[in-house]
Amino acid sequence: MALLNFRKKETPAPQAPVAEVEALLKDYSIEVMPRTAEKVEDFRALLPEGTRVYIAHIDGTPIEDMVATAARLNADGFKVMPHFPARIIKDRATLADWIARYQGEADVRQALLLAGGVTTPAGEFSDSMQLMETGLFDKAGFTRLHVAGHPEGNRDIDADGGRLNVDAALKWKNDFQTRTDAEMAIATQFAFDAQPIIEWADSLKAAGITLPIHIGIAGPAKLQTLIKFAIACGVGPSLKVLQKRAMDVTKLLLPYEPTDVISDLAAHKAAHPDFNITHVHLFPLGGIKTSATWVQENGGASGVPADAA
């Protein structure tokens, strides 16, 4: 199998200065699920004050569990941003009920709107644009709405591996900025290689899409764990980064860390201050504590936990 075709290790690329990495990681966000959040004894010992915490809503997760997780994080002083996956929401009444629960029990004012991973919609919604068009988020006074981005495409949307449909959807969402009082941004799927990310971000800017980008980055994890998630999530060309790592026998059993991709993006951001990637969003595939600790060790002041500040 090509993945295990060992070769001599390449010379490591130079790392960006600590200050540049710290700047890119400032106000980073992280993603949890109710079951992963349960394993964390104290979020304030791990995350900086006011960190935005996304709560992924996997099909089958009771809304009660989602709201309870949101309430805990809100009480700890974090900005809570639950997922609203269109295809698992039955109808407008269900959406209104979820919003009311989140706001009544957890003071939620932010949301990530996305189609969701299921193939067949549970009801009347099939994409995030339909959720936005209900007007319910503005009616409830949401201050921030994020939408999904895919630096390497999404075959659930463009079966040919292209970007025609996914880019058209982003243009629609970009135009929606003028119809909502909420601040908007793109939160992306994770990728492992900076160059395709930079090219994608530049292409959006060239197409007139002005939404700021919160780039998805996989936190430290075992190589086999990352490969499993990358394939399941449709991560494309940047899988080569993992393949290259697997060719180095000395690294096979060591956890992957996002040092290189963060360093490359930080250097690009420092050289191009108007770069439209404004924040990092961490997917803690190797564990919440592992990802938070990595930021503490590599992000300078941007990683200082709330209880240590």
Which residues are covered by each model-predicted region?
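Active-site beta->alpha loop and helix N-cap motifs at the rims of alpha/beta catalytic domains
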Residues: 2-168, 175, 287
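Glycine- and other small-residue-rich loops at beta-strand/loop junctions that grip anionic moieties
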Residues: 32, 58, 87, 162, ...
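Active-site pocket-lining/capping segments in soluble small-molecule metabolic enzymes
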Residues: 32-34, 114, 127-153, 163, ...
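Short, surface-exposed basic-aromatic patches at helix termini and helix-loop junctions that form
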Residues: 72-75, 99-104, 201-209, 296-303
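Conserved, mostly hydrophobic/aromatic
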Residues: 82, 173, 182, 215, ...
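Active-site glycine- and acidic-residue-rich loops that bind
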Residues: 90-93, 118-127, 188-201, 223, ...
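Hydrophobic, aromatic-enriched interface-forming segments
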Residues: 161-179, 183-205
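Substrate-binding cleft of secreted/luminal carbohydrate-active enzymes
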Residues: 270-288
